[in-house]
A protein has these predicted regions:
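Active-site beta-loop-alpha junctions enriched in small/polar residues
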Residues: 13-17, 40-42, 74-77, 115-117, ...
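Short, electropositive alpha-helical surface patch
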Residues: 86-98, 122-135, 160-169, 196-202, ...
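Conserved, mostly hydrophobic/aromatic
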Residues: 27, 73, 91, 102, ...
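N-terminal pre-domain/capping segments
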Residues: 1-72, 78, 82-97
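Conserved active-site loop/cleft motifs that coordinate metal ions or position small ligands
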Residues: 36, 214-217, 256-263
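Acidic (Asp/Glu)-rich catalytic clusters
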Residues: 5, 25-31, 51-71, 96-106, ...
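Active-site acidic/histidine proton-transfer and metal-coordination neighborhood
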Residues: 64, 80-177
Length: 284
């Protein structure tokens, strides 16, 4: 039976536990048609090249099932704004490997939380971030580097203004943007109001970010508008609600974007078929 949303790319963050190719079956199990993965443990610094046999098998299966685009989410430990040289080097090496692995699986990008300036202010760390990202791009090929917005937590870098400053200064076609619906709401952008979404899209255009926006993290928020706390909820079960998320995903200038879910899931095991089905009912 055909569906008007069949062509919309909707997927979720899936596990590669047991091997890279398992991400394909995990995506099919939740009825996704695109995916996001970690290229290793999300809470360990160690990053290694994907085994060649797994890469070959994965690429073949992805093509067979038409499961693209594929995004890699960087380590949560990464902090390009740190004043700790050891942490900076670990962050750089982890991102370097993610970008290299991304190129081997034709990834549409590595999604990165830039990190925290730990009270020192964005202006004091901006040049350091720019220098490190430029170095990463110089030493890798093809794979885009996606900056994700923050939820407005104290010290965390990722407001639209900060992303704009980084994008303009780095000035590289591989620099792209990922926006998270829960983070926007938690940072004070009320997606429940259609006019606010319209103003957001205009703002993205003015800041030169709309053309660099390549995907949306579609998550409901467990916390209230402007909370500054990053807590995701299942689609339609949080403070944003179905109507608010619908405002976002159906905006004419956003409706081509892949939607990646990072929700708890009905059984607390992550994105599931029910959440993806709910998103299909929101899209038109």
């Amino acid at each position: 039976m055909s569906s008007p949303t069949l062509n919309r790319k909707i997927g979720g963050h899936v596990s590669i536990a047991g091997g890279l190719t398992n991400a394909v079956q995990n995506t099919l199990d939740i009825k996704g048609n695109c995916m996001q993965i970690f290229a290793g443990s999300p809470r360990m610094w160690l990053r290694t090249p994907f085994p060649e046999d797994q890469v070959t098998s994965f690429n073949l299966k992805v093509k067979e099932q038409d499961l693209s685009p594929i995004f890699i989410h960087a380590l949560y430990l990464v902090n390009l704004a740190s004043d700790n040289p050891e942490l900076l080097e670990k962050s750089y090496q982890a991102l370097l490997m993610d970008l290299q692995n991304g190129q081997r699986i034709n990834s549409a990008g590595v999604i990165v939380h830039i990190g925290s300036h730990q009270g020192r202010g964005f202006d004091s760390v901006k040049d350091q971030i720019i220098s490190l990202v430029k170095k990463l791009l110089k030493n890798t090929k093809d794979t885009p580097f996606l900056i994700e917005n923050s939820a407005g937590q104290k010290g965390k870098i990722g407001s639209l203004e900060e992303i704009e400053a980084l994008v303009k200064s780095i000035d590289d076609p591989r620099i792209k943007v990922c926006l998270d619906s829960a983070h926007m709401f938690e940072a004070g952008i009320d997606l429940r109001e259609a006019k606010v979404v319209e103003d957001l899209v205009k703002k993205l255009g003015t800041k030169g970010l709309l053309d660099r926006l390549v995907c949306l993290h579609l998550n409901d928020s467990k916390t209230v508008l402007g909370s500054g706390h990053d807590k995701h909820e299942n689609i339609g079960e949080g403070e944003i609600g179905k109507a608010g998320l619908s405002n976002l995903v159906n905006h004419p200038k956003l409706k081509h974007l892949p939607l990646l879910l990072e929700v708890p899931g009905q059984d607390k095991k992550g994105p599931d078929q029910k959440n993806i089905q709910t998103v299909h009912t929101l899209t038109n």
